[in-house]
Amino acid sequence: MKLSRRSFMKANAVAAVAAAAGLSVPGVARAVVGQQEAIKWDKAPCRFCGTGCGVLVGTQQGRVVACQGDPDAPVNRGLNCIKGYFLPKIMYGKDRLTQPLLRMKNGKYDKEGEFTLITWDQAFDVMEEKFKTALKEKGPESIGMFGSGQWTIWEGYAASKLFKAGFRSNNIDPNARHCMASAVVGFMRTFGMDEPMGCYDDIEQADAFVLWGANMAEMHPILWSRITNRRLSNQNVTVAVLSTYQHRSFELADNGIIFTPQSDLVILNYIANYIIQNNAINQDFFSKHVNLRKGATDIGYGLRPTHPLEKAAKNPGSDASEPMSFEDYKAFVAEYTLEKTAEMTGVPKDQLEQLAQLYADPNKKVISYWTMGFNQHTRGVWANNLVYNLHLLTGKISQPGCGPFSLTGQPSACGTAREVGTFAHRLPADMVVTNEKHRDICEKKWNIPSGTIPAKIGLHAVAQDRALKDGKLNVYWTMCTNNMQAGPNINEERMPGWRDPRNFIIVSDPYPTVSALAADLILPTAMWVEKEGAYGNAERRTQFWRQQVQAPGEAKSDLWQLVQFSRRFKTEEVWPEDLLAKKPELRGKTLYEVLYATPEVSKFPVSELAEDQLNDESRELGFYLQKGLFEEYAWFGRGHGHDLAPFDDYHKARGLRWPVVNGKETQWRYSEGNDPYVKAGEGYKFYGKPDGKAVIFALPFEPAAEAPDEEYDLWLSTGRVLEHWHTGSMTRRVPELHRAFPEAVLFIHPLDAKARDLRRGDKVKVVSRRGEVISIVETRGRNRPPQGLVYMPFFDAAQLVNKLTQDATDPLSKETDFKKCAVKLEKV
């Protein structure tokens, strides 16, 4: 066969990237080169992180056989990270689930029984009985769902409708609670609207990049490649990296800063003080577009109310704040002097000054990037607010090349968890369940009785664990997440609740994960391009893809599972009589008819699909389900700053960044000439706030919930590595990625290892107040902790590091702090 130059270059690009990572990709390379003419290609966003890279998926004979970077994708411009090139292999692990499994003994469900193959009807029979019993005996607060930032947009929307409108339970929360909740609350407090104002185009125009708790070299490698290109092609560009340990992003850093855990709050306030003391405030911007407020302090640590730290807190969980003058704010940050900051953080003075000068220099366009180091923090919301302060003081915001930017870790943590509103307190388009007007808007749009959606905030992720353990949450369905491995404090909180005989646990997943094996019922699930989907990435870019292959065996999409299960319930079985009396025409109807097969959702005929286009759900139901759900959902944001384009536009485009008004996407929000919601002459308008002004918050340093002491003498931080994604449920089934990093290790400073008579390669027991794990000592490698801190990734199911972590959370966002707890080491 003939091979074009372009095809040859694509094939060699695959091999080159793999070689750089020390891997071989013979299967993928052969698929691209040797079968070029036989493969059918179609676009999709990558299945992994929140960057939102575009890929071209190659299918042949009903299987995904190849994947390459999409040269027309504006995010990655044809380049993938090493995980992206191995996307086909995540779908075909030898242990892929293809049929429901129920714990059974003597032909019946038994909590202590063995997993037994059953049919979908049998699975739904058991689920129906458990849900109806719980609802009848204990009410809507006894059921719950834990979802995902990996749900497609319409899966999250369908799940939220089923629980909040159908079952009348707000006990639905996404795993994004563990990673992005602090960013959400930070955005809402400062700007009144969620998500970043900038976009990836900032990278090519910035003069300085500051990474706060973000190892972009491994966690967002495609964006890091763009930053690297910007830095190496322009000698005036500066990169500063802040972390509690040294990692691969430090290799590019002009100013690599290692600080004591939790003391990032001190550094942020010091920089604000530096800006003021050096007359670097952008007075015109500041006077027109900013308000000042002093936040409540001593707010606790999101632990159980009986915990001593919660009892001691003066204002546990308080989000209160009060107006303050500029002079009072100036006095507040004045306490954070260079000397005090250096002492509290362990950072040399010259490094602190260099960092502060980047923000203070009016001629430097600065982007602040952060991820889990900021968000997984008992003061994560404060950290977000404090970095916004720096950009608001200097006016370095909402313009090309400068602004604060919270990066996401999941492909649709923004598009689904945040924008759709699958959090326990949220509704679509930044609306919340506690606001009567917001509930009314949803109830009218969904044509359900007024008062259907509960006003009470549901259980967040950690609260769900506690309620399961306490026997208050009795039926629990998790989808598209492996929380038994990923969530905190496994031994004390989560596992006891999952295995409590009072509770029934359902896990929907493509693979037998740690969570699945701890459940009572496992539902085999379709993944990625085995269904039609949509994700929303970190830069507000919504991206669609078509179903390209069918799932193996009887595996079904999360959307199919939700919609089909809703058929099992009639309104009178889930709603009280007073609600039914308000809309008697809904009496006798199933939740499927009320929520999904409505005139609003079912109005798009399946004939809109091409004859050869796969779409299992829509063809089974007889209408274009995904389009109907999306258009209904998109209605909530249109005209309110969250405008999404028409459904069909996304199948044609490589994603569009909202708000999309009159067919045009928005790159920079809140600034005149860039944002259609900012009128001529306004300059800037932070229209999420009633007065159009953003808020600078005065917030102090407060210590971590747990710190090293004489017995537990080391900090433990957890996180990820380049080769694996989250709990490794997909990447560890790729032989090449597994070989590259086969098991977790404990990264430790050589002197800390020597002091404990440990050498590289030794087995070591890592012990906290909550549990212990056996790991392997690593004194070299990519991560170099300072003395006093150890680092361990959480991808390894054989080394459950979250047996060690504490379930302390940010009291405002309820997000867990996975970065700070105390451990000791014992040689094995």
Curated annotation (Swiss-Prot):
GO BP annotation list: cellular respiration; Mo-molybdopterin cofactor biosynthetic process; nitrate assimilation
Reactions listed under catalytic activity: 2 Fe(II)-[cytochrome] + nitrate + 2 H(+) = 2 Fe(III)-[cytochrome] + nitrite + H2O
Listed GO CC annotations: membrane; nitrate reductase complex; periplasmic space
Sorted UniProt keywords: 4Fe-4S, Electron transport, Iron, Iron-sulfur, Metal-binding, Molybdenum, Nitrate assimilation, Oxidoreductase, Periplasm, Signal, Transport
Keyword flag Phosphoprotein: no
Binding, [4Fe-4S] cluster: C46, C49, C53, C81
Location in or out of the cell: Periplasm
Cleaved signal peptide residues: 1-31
Cofactor: [4Fe-4S] cluster; Mo-bis(molybdopterin guanine dinucleotide)
EC identifiers of the protein: 1.9.6.1
PTM (free text): Predicted to be exported by the Tat system. The position of the signal peptide cleavage has not been experimentally proven.
Pfam families on file: Molybdop_Fe4S4, Molybdopterin, Molydop_binding
Keyword Iron-sulfur: yes
GO molecular function: 4 iron, 4 sulfur cluster binding; electron transfer activity; iron ion binding; molybdenum ion binding; molybdopterin cofactor binding; nitrate reductase (cytochrome) activity
4Fe-4S Mo/W bis-MGD-type domain boundaries: 39-95
Enzyme class: oxidoreductase
Positions annotated to bind Mo-bis(molybdopterin guanine dinucleotide): 83, 150, 175, 179, 212-219, 243-247, 262-264, 372, 376, 482, 508-509, 531, 558, 718-727, 802, 819
Cofactor stoichiometry and binding remark: Binds 1 [4Fe-4S] cluster. Binds 1 molybdenum-bis(molybdopterin guanine dinucleotide) (Mo-bis-MGD) cofactor per subunit.
Binding site for substrate: F794
Subunit structure: Component of the periplasmic nitrate reductase NapAB complex composed of NapA and NapB.
HAMAP family cross-referenced by the UniProt entry: Nitrate_reduct_NapA (MF_01630)
Family recorded in the similarity comment: Belongs to the prokaryotic molybdopterin-containing oxidoreductase family. NasA/NapA/NarB subfamily.
PANTHER family: PERIPLASMIC NITRATE REDUCTASE (PTHR43105:SF11), RESPIRATORY NITRATE REDUCTASE (PTHR43105)
Role played: Catalytic subunit of the periplasmic nitrate reductase complex NapAB. Receives electrons from NapB and catalyzes the reduction of nitrate to nitrite.
Protein's name in the database: Periplasmic nitrate reductase
Protein's organism: Shigella boydii serotype 4 (strain Sb227)
